[in-house]
Amino acid sequence: EVKLEESGGGLVQPGGSMKLSCVASGFTFSNYWMNWVRQSPEKGLEWVAEIRLKSHNYETHYAESVKGRFTISRDDSKSSVYLQMNILRAEDTGIYYCTTGFAYWGQGTLVTV
């Protein structure tokens, strides 16, 4: 059974920082690109960041709205992907999901700024 479990959300003041984590199981994590996406009533579903494989030198890509503020990383030995979020803004509020190229999804973690 494939599982993705996010954690680390909560309430943070504007300008603050927060780190999200996602632990995967049930598939070969190191073989999958990983993404963070978020959902809010105002913007709907919005892609946030992507990290590719070791063979791609863990190349990363970001939405323009978070570039320079958010950092995605992964630890294949722990089947985990992370999202470090700095200089948070009210518009970053939403439910954050990790996903494997949109095939598998976690349950999400709520971030409120």
Curated annotation (Swiss-Prot):
Cross-referenced InterPro entries: Ig-like_dom, Ig-like_dom_sf, Ig-like_fold, Ig_sub, Ig_V-set, IgHV
Disulphides: 22-98
Gene Ontology CC: one annotated term: immunoglobulin complex
Keyword entries, A-Z: Adaptive immunity, Disulfide bond, Immunity, Immunoglobulin
UniProt GO molecular function: antigen binding
Domain of life: Eukaryota
A biological process term (GO) from this entry: immunoglobulin mediated immune response
Domain Ig-like: 1-113
Misc note: This chain was isolated from a myeloma protein that binds inulin.
PANTHER family from the UniProt entry: IMMUNOGLOBULIN HEAVY CHAIN
Protein name: Ig heavy chain V-III region T957
